[in-house]
Curated annotation (Swiss-Prot):
InterPro entries: Ig-like_fold (IPR013783), Ig_E-set (IPR014756), IPT_dom (IPR002909), Plexin (IPR031148), Plexin-A2_sema (IPR042826), Plexin_cytoplasmic_RasGAP_dom (IPR013548), Plexin_RBD (IPR046800), Plexin_repeat (IPR002165). Changing A396E: Abolishes interaction with SEMA6A. Residues 1261-1310 form a coiled coil. Its main location: membrane. This is Plexin-A2. PANTHER family: PLEXIN, PLEXIN-A2. PROSITE patterns: SEMA. Keywords: Cell membrane, Coiled coil, Disulfide bond, Glycoprotein, Membrane, Phosphoprotein, Repeat, Signal, Transmembrane, Transmembrane helix.
Length: 1894
């Protein structure tokens, strides 16, 4: 019986979990270049995280242990089986667990954490141990995860109730032909009495054995187990042993553990005080007594840093270099381990971590030495945690060899000397978390995972390099840590890497990312070599003919290089022979082509490694840009064998004539020569006219040589003499020399005279320039001859023009001028001139050479410091004119306000500035001017200032702020009087200087230094110059701010998203800022102080120049805070802050302008709109239509904007995270009102129509008689046809029934792919919306979450008030702007919000329906119209009410016949041809989808290779030879994955169909390729017949390749066509929206080619739109409709019978139906409606037409399936028949009636009888009391209360309250009950509460 219970549980879990699972293939990891596609498997539930992973070493199957699930996956991570392990009702305190005996503890639904997952290979089973029921295990069959046994009835079966993964490890040991042993170590969480920490257990081959998991040995004296003593727990309350890894090697089993150290006699009760040690534990395999237990600490060090906290480990073989370093063989085992630094904080280890290696031989040697020393009696056993005290080693003469397994003495044995490993690699940033290793080509390759989701690839070489990281790839987009378990695929091409929510298959190498030989072979990746002639980096086994010489380069020295002679030629040199030598070349005998960039390609002549090529001809020579003298391009060699360019070098074309000067010509990099007499540069020296005129060295060039500075006063006539070299003598007919000067843009040409080859003189001339603001102007000049032949000026000699008077208005400034200008002061004219321009008789001319020269008439123009303290020390700056020509003239002659002021030599500026320092003032001195003398105090040398200098006494009043952080950096403001006086100020906090920042007359600002005396107050003192200001002020140093938490821990690359920072003392920071550093660049953003514990910040951008649009998640190199001077937070380590890519938006339309109707939603499509972050925070979008915001709903790929009521054209702007996008504009076109002429025309037309109607009525009477006769005749015709096809129907039905039985043979009801309740409800309530806000937690931007939640809880009270809710709904329905869509939305939101209170929701619904009936009858509408359409909130609420309450009935009863009908339709349609273009089929219930031609076809059986295991039997698949390749792929996928939900299958578009002919030949079949037949402008899709595929052919579905064998040459045409028809079969992500996807392929109008399959579209072109429905259907087509109808009849009958029956396989009628029908009857009685037709119609409109028709037409609402267009058309016919069956009106049929009505004309009367009987049976059932109904509703509420987020639903409903607040408040104020309950006030209070945050 128990076994049967296990079996049922396993099968149920298996099927149900697979149905519920959602698997996606995502772009995930990013290598160093690009974004490779990795196979990925995702967690089905965000909270059910992955724990363990293992790969079967023979089959390659991947097994994943997770919370509540164990999965079996294929090698490419597609799911095969999901085995349910939880959640279950449990309590950790129940011991024994409740599965053995009842438990009195409170039970809760508890997750089952997978803690152990091991494959028992010899018995083909999987051991999976969890945390439920005290840690019981299951043995699962590897093939299907069927439970073989779940031992749980003995205490030995309870391993540990610890619900944390990564604390347990197990090792299976088995000898040939014997039962196995399971060594298992686990943490026990203080329950040492219940669970041993280490044990050895039996693992019998028979799963039913009673000894399963028993201890190997268990007696009163000795057992195969070790328990933690209670004394140890008393001493260290948090003591536990965590088992990180285990393995068997040789005759031993090893465990690697982390455990707290146990200090001698000192109790430790705080986990934070613990020191941890990592230990190796060794046991002999065959030691049941555990006498061989030895435990030694282990770890490693580098550069003095100890790494002692074990994180992960992996046992592997060493590569050759590593084996040599360890002095071991390559066959021995090496342990690779990851450690974190130190011994503290094991549960939050530091980022500083290391990869270390330990040879097992070295570990065993150290253990042997420890054993030997102990058996020699040396020291203690050193295992205090287990023994409780120091126990001396016992001396015993026992020989101890390598296989010693202990005695009953000296055991268990510990040690304190650690086993030290070899440190291969360390990192201080991104903590290492996992490790795996294997040997490739003699190298140890180690793969290390990190906490940010990156995978490091390290080549372990041993000393001296240790381990070299050669690549790092980002595996997990969200930055999740890589978990401990990693495993290789069986072919070692892939590594399986796991995070908490994702498993990813990563290739072990990505050689293809390297594009050059140098990159490839310097990458350090041992997998990679250079495949020479294929010009690619790859593994050796991927390179063709790699064994041949130089075909595959394994070291960088083997890279090919190309030498070319000559390596450059002139552009005028054409078709030259070039000699190329290829170094390290493979055999090139198959031919070489030489390519000159993209200019030309020529044949090369090969001779060994030498190639002769011809340079380009005249037409192909490149054009060299005007400003360059050469142009380089790639000279490439292309292999004719591979077609690839395999080596290249730069080749240059040069142009000598680009050089205009001799020096640049002869100094160029090319062979250029200068023709001196022709003044040109040429590559051919023979073109020079004179032999002596040829120059090819710079020394021979004509050129000017340096001379003394050329100074010319403006206006002076002077010659300019220049030195030169090699000046040419002008030849006959050539002009002479000139000097050309460019002065302020004007060119002056002056004749020049050549004296000889080394001298030339510009003739006498004067020069001028404008302006007195320039005293000295450097002028460019050149010497030319023969008009424009320029002499080189290599030193860039210039002529300097100058004016003495410019900028020298005073005597002092004049005499201060540089002596070389020879300027002086002309006293009489008071100006600066040359001596010759000053009349010597009337006025003296002063210059530096004059004796004792002094300038008279000094003047003071300004004093800069005009006040200071009387104590002196103030520096006064004096500006003026003629303030001396030497410091000695003013050194003792300055007084300020009567006080001597000492000039400072270093600050003196001749004639312009004096800076002096004030002396001490006599008491009583108040103010005065500055007085000074120049040299002597005569009147002409004396002056005084107009400004007064004042003595003041500074004072201090207050300080702000009065406290700051200990690290300093606070801006301190000191206020007082006269604090701006003096020239310098100093502020001291205690004995430290406060760094001066700025001051005004009444305040000083300075920056506080770090405290030198710790925390507490310090005195504040101020000094101004020499004055000390008394003060009693104090400044207090307090603790530096600390940051505890950042929420959320993500942003987007542009930043500016809100962050909330929580911590301590945050208010002491004046200008807090947040910073990130990425790629060496820092970015900062602002923060605002909220209070002492909270800051709000805007996230910084990643970097200012970060490229947008990259779909990568980045982690900044540094993240921290700029908090004054607090250095500890500059880099904040306790965060995993990541950046998601920026959102991007597509244009609204190609033109950028979208035409909209008023009220229509605007859909903005984009990418990365919802970052996949945990925690609920979302991006805050604001969308503006013009200046008006709109309501926004966001999903991953689109943003829905409910626009305001606007007309005209408006720009759309999207604001998010500091970015602004404009995807275009919307043009809203309002429906214009009718004009007067239009109204008159309508009235006239109406009158005419009335007359026509009267005439038609008369004619109708006459016609109806004829119709009766026609109907009888037509009915007879149908009967005859039906009898003729009866036999065909029986045969077809029998065949279909066989197929359906095959399809459903292993489908019991639990196997039907039902959607889960939440998905089902969402598709009914909110069709087409995948990610609705009600599915997730409420998200509020900023820090308003609590306020909004509080307000919404107030709103919940209002919603739960019936008076309010009814008033709210009625008010909304009265508003004209409250659209039909709004009504449906509000109804669905209310039902989701009241999901937890269905009793109340039902009460409200009944009241609304009652109101609706009243209103319907008051308006004199026909009663039968009630509930016909969804025009009120009540009607949509009724649909949703039934959807909630009939879900169980759907799953238990109605779902099965509906699913069978769907399967039957799909199977029957696919038995005949289906046109891939038009969607028409041979077998159809719909005339519109019927092929109207005779199509010849044949059924084939194809044998398909099993895609998951090519060695398993082939799968036979029925197809038609006229099927397109895509149709064949769909049928194969249906056959291979017949029991797999549609969303979890591969897509046909992602697969290629291979036709396998023999063992080698494989042909890829495609809908279009180069063999596709094209006739005129028609192109026919390829079919199996086209490829001549025969019966029983072998085919295979393989993942689509990037390139194919037979892609057509006309790629542009075919690609368009293919994409169009591919999309018709593509699964779009959600299994069909409301509108079915019609597989119509639009002909390729752009290219003029039309695509067809079975029927050309123009075959029906002559039929007008309405003809099909109205014409008589010809017999042959009607026969097919009848045949299909007859074949499917049983399935339609089964469905209708189930829906119209009150008894279903023992299940009672759903209470909801009886309850609602009784309510409608009560309403009819209340209104005295006794017409049975009206009551019948109400019930039909209420349930069958409102709910069941929707489900029949859309089975994808209930099941995880794909509904094709032909299936959709047939279901629509069935749904119409269902509707007709519920109608009370008589169906009058004629020849013009639709074919589907004619088709079921005979059946509808009997169906109507079923309906009437059904309604009558329900009426006879006993009434349901309100009490019973409420109990049922309460139970339903409890079951699904958590499916939707109530606060989110309320928030959505509130948007309508906000929109119609005035109308709602008005309605509440008018309602008496609402007034009594003050509801209007409560609504106003709610609006105020919500508006605080908005």
């Amino acid at each position: 019986m128990e076994q049967r219970r296990f079996y049922l549980r396993a099968m149920q879990a298996d099927n149900l979990s697979v149905v519920l699972l959602s698997v996606a293939w995502l772009l995930l990891a990013r290598g160093t270049t690009g974004m490779p596609q990795y196979s990925t498997f995702h967690s089905e539930n965000r909270d059910w995280t992955f724990n363990h992973l293992t790969v079967h070493r023979r089959t390659g199957a991947v097994y994943v242990g997770a919370i509540n699930r164990v999965y079996k996956l294929t090698g490419n991570l597609t799911i095969q089986v999901a085995h349910k392990t939880g959640p279950e009702e449990d309590n950790k305190a129940c011991y024994p667990p409740l599965i053995v005996q009842p438990c009195s503890e409170v039970l809760t639904l508890t997750n089952n954490v997978n803690k152990l997952l091991i494959i028992d290979y010899s018995e083909n089973r999987l051991l999976a141990c969890g945390s439920l029921y005290q840690g019981v295990c299951k043995l699962l069959r590897l093939d299907d995860l069927f439970i073989l046994v779940e031992p749980s009835h003995k205490k030995e079966h309870y391993l540990s109730s610890v619900n944390k993964t990564g604390t347990m490890y197990g090792v299976i040991v088995r000898s040939e032909g014997e039962d196995g042993k399971l060594f298992i170590g686990t943490a026990v969480d203080g329950k040492q009495d219940y669970f041993p920490t280490l044990s050895s257990r039996k693992l019998p081959r028979d799963p039913e054995s009673s000894a399963m998991l028993d201890y190997e040995l268990h007696s009163d004296f000795v057992s195969s187990l070790i328990k933690i003593p209670s004394d140890t727990l008393a001493l260290v309350s948090h003591f536990d042993i965590f088992y990180i890894y285990g393995f068997a090697s040789g005759g031993f089993v090893y465990f690697l553990t982390v455990q707290p150290e146990t200090p001698d006699g000192m109790a430790i009760n705080s986990a934070g005080d613990l020191f941890y040690t990592s230990r190796i534990v060794r046991l002999c395999k065959d030691d049941p007594k555990f006498h061989s237990y030895v435990s030694l600490p282990f770890g490693c060090t580098r550069a003095g840093v100890e790494y002692r906290l074990l994180q992960a480990a992996y046992l592997a073989k060493p590569g050759e270099a590593l084996a040599q370093a360890f002095n071991i063989s390559s066959d021995e085992d090496v342990l690779f381990a990851i450690f974190s630094k130190g011994q503290k904080q094991y549960h939050h280890p530091p980022d500083d971590s290391a990869l270390c290696a330990f040879p097992i031989r070295a570990i065993n040697l150290q253990i042997k030495e420890r054993l030997q020393s102990c058996y020699h009696g040396e020291g203690n056993l050193e295992l205090n945690w287990l023994l409780g005290k120091d126990v001396q080693c016992t001396k015993a003469p026992v020989p101890i060899d390598d296989n010693f397994c202990g005695l009953d003495i000296n055991q268990p044995l510990g040690g304190s000397t650690p086993v030290e490993g070899l440190t291969l690699y360390t990192t201080s940033r991104d903590r290492l978390t996992s490790v795996a290793s294997y040997v490739y080509n003699g190298y140890s390759v180690v793969f290390v995972g990190t906490k940010s989701g990156k995978l490091k690839k390290i080549r372990a070489d041993g000393p001296p390099h240790g381990g070299v990281q050669y690549e790092m790839v980002s595996v997990f987009k969200d930055g999740s840590p890589i978990l401990r378990d990693m495993a290789f695929s069986i072919n070692q091409l892939y590594l399986y890497v796991m995070s908490e929510r994702q498993v990813t298959r990563v290739p072990v190498e990505s050689c293809e990312q390297y594009t050059t030989c140098g990159e490839c072979l310097s990458s350090g990746d041992p997998h990679c070599g250079w495949c020479a002639l294929h010009n690619m980096c790859s593994r050796r086994d991927k390179c063709q003919r790699a064994w041949e010489a130089n075909r595959f380069a394994a070291s960088i020295s083997q890279c090919m290089s190309l030498e070319v002679h000559p390596n450059s030629i002139s552009v005028s040199d054409h078709s030259r022979l070039l000699s190329l030598v290829v170094n390290d070349a493979p055999n090139l005998s198959e031919g070489i082509a030489c390519a000159f960039g993209n200019l030309t390609e020529v044949e090369g002549q090969v001779s060994g490694s030498q190639v002769i090529c011809i340079s380009p001809g005249p037409k192909d020579v490149p054009v060299i840009p005007l400003d360059q003298d050469w142009f380089g391009l790639e000279l490439q060699l292309r292999s004719k064998e591979t077609g690839k360019i395999f080596v290249s070098t730069e080749f240059k074309f040069y142009n000598c004539s680009a050089h205009q000067l001799c020096l640049s010509c002869v100094n160029s990099a090319f062979r250029c020569h200068w023709c001196k007499y022709r003044n040109l540069c040429t590559h051919d020296p023979t073109t020079c006219s004179f032999q002596e005129g040829r120059i090819n060295v710079s020394e021979d060039c004509p050129q000017l040589v340096p001379t003394e500075e050329i100074l010319i006063p403006v206006g002076e006539v002077k010659p300019i003499t220049l030195k030169a070299r090699n000046l040419p003598q002008p030849q006959s007919g050539q002009r002479g020399y000139e000097c050309v000067l460019s002065i302020q843009g004007a060119v002056h040409r002056v004749p020049a005279l050549r004296f000889n080859s080394s001298s030339v003189q510009c003739q006498n001339s004067s020069y001028q320039y404008d302006g007195m603001d320039i005293s000295n102007l450097a002028v460019d000049f050149a010497v030319v001859w023969n008009g424009n032949f320029i002499i080189d000026n290599p030193q860039d000699l210039k002529v300097h023009l100058y004016k003495c008077a410019a900028q020298r208005e005073s005597c002092g400034l004049c005499l201060k001028a540089d002596h070389k200008f020879e300027c002086g002061w002309c006293s009489g004219e008071r100006r600066c001139t040359l001596h010759q321009h000053c009349p010597s008789t009337s006025s003296p001319w002063l210059d530096w050479s004059s004796h004792n020269v002094k300038c008279s008439n000094p003047q003071i123009t300004e004093i800069l410091t005009v006040s200071g303290p009387p104590e002196g020390g103030t520096r006064v700056t004096i500006h003026g004119v003629n303030l001396g020509l030497d410091f000695s003239e003013i050194a003792h002659h300055v007084q300020v306000a009567g006080v001597p002021c000492t000039p400072i030599p270093g600050e003196y500026i001749i004639a312009e500035q004096i800076v002096c320092e004030m002396g001490h003032a006599v008491i009583g001195t108040t103010s005065g001017p500055v007085r000074l003398c120049i040299g002597e105090c005569k009147p002409e040398f004396m002056t005084k200032s107009h400004q007064q200098y004042t003595f003041v006494n500074p004072s201090v009043l207050s300080l702000s702020p009065i406290r700051g952080p200990e690290s300093g950096g606070t801006m301190v403001t000191i206020t007082g009087h006269y604090l701006g006086a003096g020239s310098s100020v100093a502020v001291y906090l205690g004995n430290q200087t406060c760094e001066f920042y700025g001051r005004s007359m009444n305040e000083i600002v300075c920056v506080s230094p770090p405290s030198s005396n710790g925390l507490g107050p310090v005195p504040v003192s101020v000094s101004v110059d020499r004055a000390r200001v008394d003060s009693s002020l104090q400044f207090e140093y307090i603790d530096d701010p600390r940051v505890q938490r950042i929420e959320p821990e993500w942003s987007i690359t542009s930043g500016h998203t809100p962050l909330t920072i929580t911590g301590f003392n945050l208010d002491v920071i004046q200008e807090p800022r947040v910073r990130v550093k990425f790629n060496g660049k820092e970015s900062v953003n602002v923060c605002t102080v909220v209070n002492t514990t909270t800051l709000t910040c805007l996230a910084p951008s990643l970097t200012s120049d970060y490229r947008p649009g990259l779909d990568t998640v980045e982690r900044p190199d540094e993240f921290g805070f700029l908090f004054n001077n607090v250095q500890s937070l500059l880099i904040y380590n306790d965060t995993k802050f990541i950046y998601y890519p920026n959102p991007t938006f597509e244009l609204l339309s190609p033109t950028g302008i979208l035409d909209q109707k008023p009220g229509s939603p605007i859909i903005l499509k984009g990418k990365n709109l919802c970052p996949p972050a945990s925690g609920g925070a979302k991006l805050n979008y604001t969308v503006m239509i013009g200046e008006t915001p709109c309501t926004v709903t966001v999903s991953e790929t689109q943003l829905l904007c409910e626009p305001p009521n606007l007309t005209g054209q408006h720009k759309v702007m999207v604001h998010v995270g500091g970015m602004v996008f404009s995807p275009g504009s919307v043009s809203v076109i309002s429906d214009s009102l009718l004009t007067l002429p239009a109204i008159i025309s309508i009235a006239a037309g109406g009158s005419l129509l009335l007359i026509i109607v009267i005439i038609v009525l008369i004619a109708y009477k006459r016609k109806s008689r004829e119709n009766d006769l026609t109907l009888k005749r037509l009915q007879m015709q149908m009967d005859n046809l039906e009898s003729r096809v009866a036999l065909e129907c029986k045969e077809a039905f029998a065949e279909l029934q066989t197929d359906i039985n095959e399809l459903t043979s292993d489908l019991d009801r639990s196997g039907i792919p039902y959607l889960d309740y939440r998905t089902y409800a969402m598709r009914v309530l909110f069709p087409g919306i995948e990610d609705h806000p009600v599915l997730r937690e409420l998200e509020v931007q900023g820090n308003g979450q609590q306020h909004v939640e509080k307000a919404l809880k107030l709103f919940a009270q209002l919603i739960n008030n019936k008076v309010f809710l009814l008033t709210f709904i009625r008010t909304l329905e009265l508003q004209r702007s409250f659209s039909m869509r709004d009504r449906g939305n509000v109804a669905s939101l209310i039902m989701t919000g009241l999901q937890g209170r269905l009793e109340y929701a039902t009460d409200v619904l009944k009241q609304l329906l009652s109101d609706l009936i009243d209103k319907n009858l008051e308006n004199k509408n026909h009663p039968k119209l009630l509930l016909r359409r969804t025009e009120s909130v009540a009607e949509k609420m009724l649909t949703n009410w039934f959807a909630f309450l009939l879900h169980k009935f759907l799953k238990e009863c109605a779902g099965e016949p509906l699913f069978m009908l769907y399967c039957a339709i799909k199977q029957q349609m696919e038995k005949g041809p289906i046109d891939a273009i038009t969607g028409e089929a041979r077998y159809s219930l719909s005339e519109d989808k019927l092929i109207r031609q005779q199509i010849e076809y044949k059924t084939l059986i194809l044998n398909c290779v099993n895609p998951d295991n090519e060695n398993s039997p082939e799968i036979p698949v029925k197809v038609l030879n006229c099927d397109t390749i895509t149709q064949v792929k769909e049928k194969i996928l249906d056959a291979v994955y017949k029991n797999v939900p549609y969303s979890q299958r591969p897509r046909a578009v992602d697969m290629d169909l291979e036709w396998r002919q023999g063992r080698i030949a494989r042909v890829v079949l495609q809908d279009e390729d180069i063999t596709t037949k094209i006739e005129g402008d028609w192109k026919r899709l390829n079919t199996l017949m086209h490829y001549q595929v025969s019966d029983r052919s072998v085919v295979a579905l393989v993942p689509k390749q990037t390139s194919s064998y037979n892609i057509p040459a006309s790629a542009s045409i075919s690609r368009t066509s293919i994409s169009r028809y591919d999309s018709s079969f593509r699964y779009t992500g959600s299994p069909d929206s409301l509108r079915s996807r019609v597989p119509m392929i639009t002909p390729d109008l752009e290219s003029g080619v039309k695509v067809w399959h079975l029927v050309k579209n123009h075959d029906h072109g002559d039929q007008k739109e309405g003809d099909r429905g109205s014409k008589m259907v010809s017999e042959i087509y009607l026969t097919r409709l009848l045949a299909t109808k007859g074949t499917l009849q049983k399935f339609v009958d089964d469905l209708f019978e189930t829906l119209f029956s009150t008894v279903h396989r023992g299940s009672a009628l759903p209470l909801a139906i009886k309850y609602m029908f009784d309510f409608l009857d009560e309403q009819a009685d209340r209104h005295s409606i006794h017409d049975t037709d009206v009551r019948h119609t109400w019930k039909s409109n209420c349930l069958p037409l409102r709910f069941w028709v929707n489900v029949i037409k859309n089975p994808q609402f209930v099941f995880d399936i794909h509904k094709g267009s032909i299936t959709d058309a047939c279901l629509s016919v069935v749904a119409q028949t269902f509707m007709d069956s519920c109608s009370t009106s008589e169906h009058r049929l004629g020849k013009d009636s639709p074919s589907n009505k004619l088709l079921y004309a005979k059946d509808i009367p009997s169906y109507k009888n079923w309906v009437e009987r059904y309604y009558a049976d329900i009426a006879k059932l006993p009434a349901i009391s309100d009490q019973d109904m409420n109990a049922y509703l309460a139970e339903q509420s409890r079951l699904h209360a958590t499916e939707f987020n109530m606060l989110s639903a309320l928030n959505e409903i509130y948007s309508y309250v906000s929109k119609y607040s005035e109308e709602l408040i008005g309605a509440l104020e008018q309602d008496e009950q609402a007034r009594r309950q003050r509801l209007a006030y409560k609504v106003e209070h709610l609006i105020n509460a919500m508006s605080i945050e908005s």
